[in-house]
Swiss-Prot record:
This is Phosphoribosylformylglycinamidine cyclo-ligase. Pathway: Purine metabolism; IMP biosynthesis via de novo pathway; 5-amino-1-(5-phospho-D-ribosyl)imidazole from N(2)-formyl-N(1)-(5-phospho-D-ribosyl)glycinamide: step 2/2. It holds the Pfam family AIRS_C. It is an enzyme of class 6 (ligase). GO terms for molecular function: ATP binding; phosphoribosylamine-glycine ligase activity; phosphoribosylformylglycinamidine cyclo-ligase activity. GO terms for biological process: 'de novo' IMP biosynthetic process; adenine biosynthetic process. It is found in: Cytoplasm. Belongs to the AIR synthase family. One of its GO terms (cellular component) is cytosol. The gene is purM. InterPro entries: PurM-like_C_dom (IPR010918), PurM-like_C_sf (IPR036676), PurM-like_N (IPR016188), PurM-like_N_sf (IPR036921), PurM_cligase (IPR004733).
Length: 336
């Protein structure tokens, strides 16, 4: 008996490494000293006076179930990168490098490569290097054809350029940056609504969406790195990545207890997919705002005097952005 008999194919793992090396190479920056293949990725830090390293880790959650149902694996890697880098940039940091963890019961290189291609694409959009990762073959641990992902991102910022959320005060404006769709949160509820309660198939064409349900649900999470870079000349007082917990749980993370975010519903158009979920699932409005991004993937808080310039810069790079509310004196966290 050997390791392969027990369900772990080392040769398949080595084959995968050879396949992904050239893919990862397309993401490398001048600061990468050693990337995929070594025991560790090496990254050199230059030209910083008082640097602070910022780290984040995340996954894609049960959105992966949609990828399995569709047998489409080339976009979930973008989701993985987005979930990590969007958390890093809210501090004022620039993403430097990324690592991934891919775990499956029986390794299929062709599937794994599609995932890695998505990760590399996400890294290129975010301007960070894919310098390493781990592929784990765990026989008997996952259902056939299924896998799980985790991502790890490190960014950097000068200490004096860290976003100071303590400066947020009454009257500050809340700018919302449009999401690309559901992003990567709330999929357990999404699957319950569409597939269990209403017996939809991922192949069903949804006229309101103009596409098959599966394609709509797999739309990649938006990466906001370039959008936030466009605002670097302005004083950003705070940012919130609208992920699990939606508006209700994420925006208060950057607010003092004496102030709240008053959101003006109707100041942006809620994407059709959320209206469908709410109607088909008979979900209360506040629950929607606590589960989903509702069309706003990133919130940026600025002084009212900077609003016009911020919108001009964002619109100038093709970013859809809206003034969606203001900061008020209250202990309510988020007021809808």
């Amino acid at each position: 008996m050997n390791y392969k008999d027990a369900g772990v194919n080392i040769d398949e793992g080595n084959k995968l490494v050879k396949m992904i090396k050239p893919i990862a190479k397309t993401t490398l920056t001048a600061n990468v000293l050693e990337g995929i293949g070594g025991f560790a990725g090496l990254f050199e830090i230059k030209n910083y006076k008082n640097p602070v390293l910022i780290s984040s880790t995340d996954g894609v959650g049960t959105k992966l179930k949609i990828a399995f149902m569709m047998d489409k694996h080339d976009t979930v890697g973008i989701d993985l990168v987005a979930m990590c880098v969007n958390d890093v940039i809210v501090t004022g940091a620039k993403p430097l490098f990324f690592l991934d963890y891919f775990a499956t019961g029986k390794l299929k290189s062709e599937t794994a490569v599609e995932v890695i291609k998505g990760i590399a694409e996400g890294c290129k959009i975010a301007g960070c290097a894919l310098i390493g990762g781990e592929t784990a073959e765990l026989p008997g641990f996952y259902k056939e054809g299924e896998y799980d992902l985790a991502g790890f991102c490190v960014g950097i910022v000068e200490k004096e350029e860290l976003i100071d959320t303590k400066s947020i005060k009454k009257g500050d404006a809340i700018i919302g940056l449009a999401s690309s769709g559901i992003h990567s949160n709330g999929y357990s509820l999404v699957r319950k609504v569409f597939f269990e309660k209403n017996n939809f198939s991922v192949k069903d064409f949804i006229p309101e969406l103009g596409m098959n349900l599966g394609d709509a649900l797999l739309t990649p999470t938006k990466i906001y790195v370039k959008s936030i870079e466009a605002l670097k000349e302005l004083k950003i007082k705070g940012m919130a990545h609208i992920t699990g917990g939606g508006f209700i749980d994420n925006i208060p993370r950057i607010l003092r207890k004496s102030i709240a975010a008053k959101i003006n519903k109707g100041s942006w158009k809620i994407p059709t997919i959320f209206n469908l979920i709410q109607r088909l699932g008979d979900i209360e409005e506040r629950e929607m705002y606590r589960t989903f991004n509702m069309g706003i993937g990133m919130v940026v808080i600025v002084d009212p005097s900077d609003v016009d310039k911020a919108l001009e810069k964002l619109n100038g790079i093709g970013e859809k952005a809206y003034v969606i509310g203001e900061i008020v004196e209250s202990e309510g966290g988020v007021i809808l």
